[in-house]
Regions:
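Single-stranded RNA-binding regions, centering on S1/OB-family and related RNA-binding modules
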Residues: 1-243
């Protein structure tokens, strides 16, 4: 056996050992965000959507980390990946002493600190400003490992009164908005509704019952047909038929 064949056989044997060890090791899963350390690289190898960074196995994507001899991340389709500066929509899930816990549809709950409100709020009576179940249009101002902090200190942010909230795949949001807002303005004008689109895929619609339903159906059409050509024409036709 020549040297090249011997090296090839050794590589195959090493790969087989790693594969068998991975199968035999009991694997665990946990939700991770990009940049999060999953485990030490001392006893593990990076797999899909992970990397070795300074001796640690680190996640490259949002998803479920599967931890065995080889560590990989299974991406979760359609999950919202928060970024600083995003304007998003969420619902108050809990009222704390120093702020509100907001469900924004991501892997972690977000927090709106009391000091990020644009006006004075009595910390002993915070539910007068926002209570559990209230919908809010907020901005992401900080993203750290395992936490997202929000703010209301920008124009157009605040509590969303009445209406309905629907949810779409956040990756389809640009198609719903359209170039320079053309698509969403088309729907607003036709249905006579107020619409706020959150970059997390939550969309608030307010108008007459008929208008809200029609707007919701139009947005559902966009989500279904987002990969196809002639989308604007299809939406115009749909809206025209519903008059």
């Amino acid at each position: 056996m020549d040297k090249e064949e011997k090296n090839t056989q050794t590589d195959v044997e090493e790969t087989k050992e790693v594969s068998e060890a991975d199968v035999q090791t009991k694997k665990e899963r946990k939700l991770v965000v990009p940049g999060e350390t999953i485990v030490s690289a001392d006893d593990h190898l990076p797999g899909d959507y992970t990397r070795n960074e300074d001796g640690d196995i680190v996640a490259n994507r949002y998803g479920l980390a599967e931890i065995g001899k080889i560590v990989k991340v299974i991406p979760i389709s359609g999950i919202y990946e928060p970024r600083r500066g995003n304007t998003i929509i969420g619902r108050v899930e809990d009222v704390m002493f120093s702020g509100w816990v907001i469900d924004v549809g991501g892997p972690y709950r977000a927090f709106l600190p009391l000091m990020e409100c644009p006006r004075f709020v009595d910390k002993f009576n915070m539910t007068e400003f926002a209570n559990v179940g209230d919908a809010m249009n907020v901005k992401v101002w900080s993203v750290k490992k395992g936490s997202v902090d929000l703010s209301l200190k920008s124009r157009g942010l605040g509590k969303l009164e009445g209406g309905r909230i629907i949810r779409i795949n956040p990756h389809k949001v640009p198609r719903v908005i359209g170039k320079e807002g053309s698509m969403i303005n088309l729907i607003k004008d036709d249905t006579q509704t107020e619409i706020t689109v959150g970059q997390n895929g939550y969309i608030w619609i307010k108008g007459s019952e008929e208008g809200e339903r029609k707007a919701e159906d139009a947005i559902a059409l966009i989500e279904r047909e987002s990969a196809n050509d002639g989308l604007t024409g299809k939406v115009e036709k749909f809206l025209g038929e519903k008059k």
